């Protein structure tokens, strides 16, 4: 199993011989609702769009997960699996094979990878977007992804999970508090799922941000601090900080309990 971190929330996941592009923002700026004075993300150098993609997986319909300029550059015939909000985005862009997953629903890619949607991040007072469990059916190895650190207690039933992709630092706004939840949330999900590896997401990569929101943001925590917290809580989980753009193999060992069913 190989992964490549593509900055922000974006990953290339190579699992069971399939190449899954997760929440891609690879070209152009990142702006929410065309309000660039509030928040704007840019890349000093654009990422090349990976080729031979078997599936695009989108956790949310917001621009930092379903990034329209990037999605416009990708082949519209690539199958897409996403939250209902994300499905609307790619439908408007003319994608031809779209699967909208509600919480608890599953999609199987070529009888080799099972993708299960779980409750994810809140968007507004009533809407929960998606987190995902990706299971390699031949080995039982499983990846959990929740890009903003909102982990549903329903995940406990799927333990153990081998790899957890989640923020491990907090991004905090005055008065509002953390809107990216790392630290405590990441420790909690580590205790639930007992992962072999945790991979930080959302707050890293070769990107630059500007705008009023960025001036107010405060980051709390670090990978080294979180690794120490895991050890203090007697967890053997290893934190790996990937080099953006560099493909790496996950150092996973088979576990007797990995044969659970979704």
Located regions from the model:
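Conserved beta-strand hairpin/beta-sheet module of binuclear metal-dependent hydrolase folds
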Residues: 1-45, 128-147, 163
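Pre-active-site segment of Zn-dependent metallo-hydrolases
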Residues: 18-57, 68-73, 124, 150-157
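Active-site neighborhood of phospho(di)ester-bond hydrolases with catalytic His/Asp-centered motifs
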Residues: 22-23, 53-66, 81-84, 143-149, ...
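Active-site HxH/HxHxD metal-binding segment of metal-dependent hydrolases
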Residues: 42-107
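Local beta-strand N-terminus motif with an aromatic residue
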Residues: 53, 77, 160-161, 195
């Amino acid at each position: 199993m190989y992964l490549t971190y593509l900055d922000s929330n974006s990953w290339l996941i190579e699992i069971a011989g399939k190449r899954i592009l997760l929440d891609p923002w690879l070209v152009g700026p990142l702006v929410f609702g065309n309000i660039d004075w509030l928040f704007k993300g840019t890349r000093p150098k654009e990422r090349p769009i990976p080729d031979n993609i078997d599936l695009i997986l989108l956790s949310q319909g917001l621009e930092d997960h379903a990034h329209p300029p990037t999605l416009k550059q990708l082949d519209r015939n690539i199958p897409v699996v996403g939250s209902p909000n994300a499905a609307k985005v790619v439908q408007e862009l003319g994608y031809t094979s779209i699967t909208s997953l509600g919480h608890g629903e599953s999609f199987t890619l070529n009888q080799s990878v099972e993708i299960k949607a779980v409750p994810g991040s809140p968007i507004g007072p009533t809407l929960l977007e998606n987190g995902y469990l990706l299971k390699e059916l031949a080995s039982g190895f499983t990846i959990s992804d929740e890009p903003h650190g909102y982990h549903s207690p329903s995940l406990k039933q799927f333990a153990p999970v081998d790899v957890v992709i989640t923020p491990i630092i907090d991004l905090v706004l005055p008065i509002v508090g953390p809107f990216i939840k790392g630290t405590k949330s990441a420790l909690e999900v580590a205790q639930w799922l007992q992962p072999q590896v945790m991979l930080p997401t959302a707050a890293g990569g070769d990107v630059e941000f500007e705008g009023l929101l960025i001036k107010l943001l405060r980051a709390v925590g670090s990978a080294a601090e979180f690794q120490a917290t895991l050890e203090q809580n007697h967890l053997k989980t290893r934190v790996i900080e990937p080099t953006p753009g560099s493909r790496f193999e996950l150092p996973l060992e088979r576990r007797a309990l990995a044969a659970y069913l979704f």
